[in-house]
């Protein structure tokens, strides 16, 4: 019991930064940060309890880093939807995930995205998250001549730079909870610098803030169009890969894997994740998913649901310390955002750079996510590039039918390519006649998974 409890505490310390970062990111959409904090803590606690009792595994869940950026900067700021519509999309995504898990359809979605594109998507999201951190701190600013440039060294930018260095040093020293401590140190340093605003009569403990500003604030009226359908698919895709990749990666080489290399009770864990996403959206936060930081608790000896239950209890306790977490300035979270980006770049060496037909789509995916400031467009351009290059280089057998159908329909392709000044025949029109003649002789290959952050 002692080992499991300590493992749960370790997991919480390594992922507690989400309590400061998530309200900061979602708050930029106009959502009430205090309500988002409560939603984040409650959703994390409820989802982690679900995985403790349904799957009896030592994993913890919370709003996903990466998908929260997709929610704020692609759905709301990029595509112009309200945050209420974005929450509705997340809720629907959770329902779809529940259905896919119940009927074991998720394997087909896993198969449809080529391995190197999975690595590229993971790394691209990491670069995007780091760019958000640098931009929010004013380290990188817009420029009419060069598009972006180095900003002025304001107190906010200086504090963010300190945070990057402090977080990097703590991680290099293998300090448990390095990102959390990095945020805490920068918040304290920010007080004399005038960046951290300490209100008069500050009390660090209070009753949990109300969920009224975000609870069940859904707007389903804008969901019935093709753009939103593709967006929901992207959310489902990222959630599935994030969850399955984390479960397999963190459970590797432990008794949680069976003799076939599968995670025990993985279906129950996936169902807990799917339920948590819809519950989280109802409370007022972006997609909830299994956190890779769960590996820290597993490394400390956590093997059962007691580890998860301990982590969930600490998230509930954190509800009463909202003033402390909401005191954190956005500059203090820059170090955490940049380091998360660094962690997600570990997929880059796995990309096959010796094959241009694999390397080019991967590169397009990563660079366009950052330069378009849009995760969805980066994913779409990468998939279109992959399909075109493979098709025109005579490697069309490597394109799955599913990939062709879900990535390049006439309407989506025309809308996306119009933005970059190109016109092109529908790849589906070119590809399907070829595929139909060889489909029976070209089965899809099951590919390994990759964590998407």
Go through the PLM ranges and name each one:
Residues 79-192, 196, 309-411:
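Membrane-embedded alpha-helical modules
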Residues 45-65, 96:
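Juxtamembrane transmembrane-helix boundary signature
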Residues 418-420, 445-446:
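Polybasic, lysine-rich low-complexity intrinsically disordered segments
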Residues 30-49:
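Loop-to-helix transition at the N-terminal end of transmembrane alpha-helices
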Residues 1-35, 149, 181-267:
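Helix-loop-helix hairpins and the membrane-proximal interhelical loops
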Residues 422-424:
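Cysteine-centered motifs
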Residues 1-22, 43, 64-125, 252-347:
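Helix-loop-helix junctions within the multi-pass membrane cores of secondary transporters/permeases
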């Amino acid at each position: 019991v002692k080992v499991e409890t300590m493992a749960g505490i370790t997991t919480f310390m390594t992922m507690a930064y989400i309590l400061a970062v998530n309200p900061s990111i979602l708050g930029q959409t106009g959502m009430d940060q205090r309500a988002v904090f409560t939603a984040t803590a409650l959703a994390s606690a409820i989802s982690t309890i679900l995985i403790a009792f349904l799957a009896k595994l030592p994993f913890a869940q919370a709003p996903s880093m990466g998908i929260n950026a997709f929610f704020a900067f692609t759905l709301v700021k990029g595509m112009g939807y309200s945050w209420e519509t974005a929450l509705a999309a997340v809720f629907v995504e959770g329902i779809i995930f529940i259905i896919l898990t119940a009927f074991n359809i998720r394997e087909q979605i896993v198969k449809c995205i080529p391995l190197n594109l999975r690595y590229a998507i993971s790394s691209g999201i990491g670069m995007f998250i780091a760019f958000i951190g640098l931009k929010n701190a004013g380290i990188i600013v817009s420029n009419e001549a060069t598009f972006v440039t180095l900003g002025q060294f304001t107190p906010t930018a200086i504090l963010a730079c300190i945070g990057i260095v402090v977080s990097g040093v703590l991680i290099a020293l293998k300090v448990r909870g390095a990102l959390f401590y990095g945020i805490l140190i920068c918040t304290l340093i920010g007080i004399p610098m005038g960046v951290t605003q300490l209100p008069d009569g500050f009390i660090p403990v209070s009753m949990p803030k109300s969920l009224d500003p975000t609870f069940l604030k859904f707007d389903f009226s804008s969901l019935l169009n093709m753009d939103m359908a593709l967006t929901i698919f992207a959310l489902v895709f990222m959630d599935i890969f994030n969850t399955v990749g984390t479960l397999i990666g963190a459970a590797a080489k432990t008794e949680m894997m069976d003799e076939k290399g599968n995670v025990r009770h993985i279906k129950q864990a996936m169902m807990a994740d799917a339920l948590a996403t819809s519950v989280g959206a109802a409370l007022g936060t972006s997609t909830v998913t299994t956190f890779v930081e769960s590996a820290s608790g597993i490394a400390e000896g956590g093997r059962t649901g007691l580890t998860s239950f301990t982590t969930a209890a600490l998230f509930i306790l954190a509800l009463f310390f909202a003033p402390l977490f909401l005191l954190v300035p956005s500059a203090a979270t820059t170090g955490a955002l940049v380091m998360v980006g660094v962690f997600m770049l570990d997929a880059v060496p796995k990309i096959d750079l010796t094959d241009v037909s694999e390397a080019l789509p991967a590169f397009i995916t990563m660079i366009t996510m950052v330069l378009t400031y849009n995760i969805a467009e980066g994913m779409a351009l990468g998939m279109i590039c992959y399909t075109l290059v493979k098709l025109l280089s005579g490697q069309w057998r490597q394109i799955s039918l599913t990939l062709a159908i879900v990535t390049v329909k006439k309407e989506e392709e025309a809308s996306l390519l119009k933005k970059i000044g190109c016109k092109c025949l529908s790849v589906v029109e070119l590809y399907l006649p070829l595929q139909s003649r060889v489909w029976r002789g070209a089965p899809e290959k099951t590919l390994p998974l990759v964590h998407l952050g």
